[in-house]
UniProtKB/Swiss-Prot annotation:
ATP-dependent specificity component of the Clp protease. It directs the protease to specific substrates. Can perform chaperone functions in the absence of ClpP. It comes from Kocuria rhizophila (strain ATCC 9341 / DSM 348 / NBRC 103217 / DC2201). PROSITE patterns: CLPX_ZB (PS51902). Transmembrane segments: none annotated. ATP binds at P129, T130, G131, S132, G133, K134, T135, Y136. Residues 1-54 form the ClpX-type ZB domain. This is ATP-dependent Clp protease ATP-binding subunit ClpX. Keywords: ATP-binding, Chaperone, Metal-binding, Nucleotide-binding, Zinc. GO terms for cellular component: HslUV protease complex. The keyword Chaperone applies. Zn(2+) binds at C13, C16, C35, C38. Belongs to the ClpX chaperone family. GO terms for molecular function: ATP binding; ATP hydrolysis activity; ATP-dependent protein folding chaperone; protein dimerization activity; unfolded protein binding; zinc ion binding. GO terms for biological process: cell division; proteolysis involved in protein catabolic process.
């Protein structure tokens, strides 16, 4: 019986459960005990977290020129938009860096006193036609900064309680992109496309509920500004025990984008460049360039609510791409489509080339379809599909040439065998 009594009175660590006989030291607190091993483990965890913060602080933050140069490698044209994005992103992460490293953002007063101020974040609105490079710009930014990146579509969002996706689902995508590392997610980038589709249906507030327009704008306000949001993991296997994941959006950069069809007319009416009445000249508004002319009142008239506009202080406009721009997109960027398909053909030991006229025809076709740069891959796939189907089964093919007729579907891409090339080489030698 004595042994039983002794075991009952034996003190144990409240954290690991080891008894005082199994550890070197047991420190007592108010109704709790902690052993030396648990203290050592706690110190290791704290040191590891401090090291991570220090390393993050010491990592060089890309300057606007470096961000711009990176975008130049991947995105053709849109110079003003690239400059605006580079500056906005640099200021955003400089603001975060100052907060993480414990720097005080202060403003010196007239009498030498310092008043601490809070620097608000600058979310970004991209305005540009379909296929002008809005999504690709955001993706390239995230790649340069090495931060989690999530893409969402505003058209699928509705107010909480209605059929559709809640705005919290956007945050869940970012958390998933960060592999459920909430600290990384809280410094990530969220890109929301088709933001113009959630404009309210009329300029005047309606008595009927607009659950996919103004209602979504209202729901987005808090996460755009910065709040601690509760996100349901929806069966996330890495956190099955948690009902909600809590993420602070204060340092999440939001880039929202849309085509804003019809905004050109609003800008023209404001600037007095659009005639009114039956005698006014008819002009295709799709050809009007509004770069650098968009003002908050234009967005308000389009259907965005004032509070939503106020949370998007940086507005960058993208121009419609020309045929020359499209040809450059096909050939110049690091991951240009022509380079990608040449690499695919090289893997089969075949050289792929394009006539200059063929490249122009592809660019014109993409513009005619109204799909912009994102339609280029579909056109190339359609042109090269017959060749790519037959190529793996043929060992005699040395080269493939895409001509203007091949783009127009008047002929297939020209195929040159090793024998044909050798015969041509001998003919040139004899000549």
């Amino acid at each position: 019986m004595a042994r039983i009594g002794e075991s009952v009175d034996l003190l144990k660590c409240s954290f690991c459960g080891k008894s005082q006989k199994q550890v070197r030291k047991l420190i007592a607190g108010p109704r709790v005990y902690i052993c030396d091993e648990c203290i050592e483990l706690c110190n290791e965890i704290i040191e590891e977290e401090l090291t991570e913060v220090t390393e993050a602080d010491q990592t060089e933050l890309p300057r606007p020129k470096q961000v711009y140069d990176h975008l130049q490698e991947y995105v053709i044209g849109q110079e003003p938009a690239k400059r605006s994005l580079a500056v906005a992103v640099y200021n955003h992460y400089k603001r975060i860096r100052a907060g993480v490293s414990g720097h005080t953002l202060s403003l010196a007063g007239a009498e030498g006193d310092e008043e601490a101020i809070e620097v608000a974040k600058s979310n970004i609105l991209l305005v540009g036609p379909t296929g002008s490079g809005k999504t690709y710009l955001a993706q390239s930014l995230a790649k340069k900064l090495d931060v989690p990146f999530a893409v969402a579509d505003a058209t699928s969002l509705t107010e909480a309680g209605y059929v559709g996706e809640d705005v919290e689902n956007i945050l869940l995508k970012l958390i998933q992109a960060a592999d459920f590392d909430l600290k990384k997610a809280e410094q990530g980038i969220i890109y929301i496309d088709e933001i113009d589709k959630i404009s309210r249906k009329s300029e005047n507030p309606s008595i009927t509920r607009d659950v996919s327009g103004e209602g979504v704008q209202q729901a987005l306000l808090k996460i755009l500004e910065g709040t601690v949001a509760s996100v349901p993991p929806q069966g996330g296997r890495k956190h099955p025990q948690q009902e909600f994941l809590h993420i602070d959006t204060t340092n999440v950069l939001f880039i929202v984008a849309g085509a804003f069809a019809g905004l050109e007319e609003i800008v023209q009416q404001r600037t007095g460049k659009k005639g009114i009445g039956f005698g006014a000249p008819i002009r295709d508004t799709a050809d009007v360039d509004i770069a650098g002319q968009v003002q908050p009142e234009d967005l308000l008239k389009f259907g965005l609510i004032p509070e939503f506009i106020g949370r998007l202080p940086v507005v960058a406009t993208l121009s419609k791409l020309s045929v020359a721009d499209m040809v450059r997109i096909l050939t110049e960027p690091r991951n240009a489509l022509v380079k990608q398909y040449r690499k695919l053909f090289q893997l089969d030991g075949v050289e792929l080339t394009f006539d200059p006229q063929a490249l122009e025809a592809i660019a014109e076709l993409a513009l005619e379809r109204g799909t912009g740069a994102r339609g280029l891959r579909a056109i190339l796939e359609d042109i090269l599909m017959p060749v790519m189907f037959d190529l793996p089964g043929r060992e005699d093919v040395a080269a493939v040439l895409v001509t203007e007729d091949a783009v127009a579907k008047l002929a297939d891409p020209e195929i040159f065998t090793h024998e044909m090339i050798e015969a041509e080489r001998r003919r040139h030698k004899s000549a």
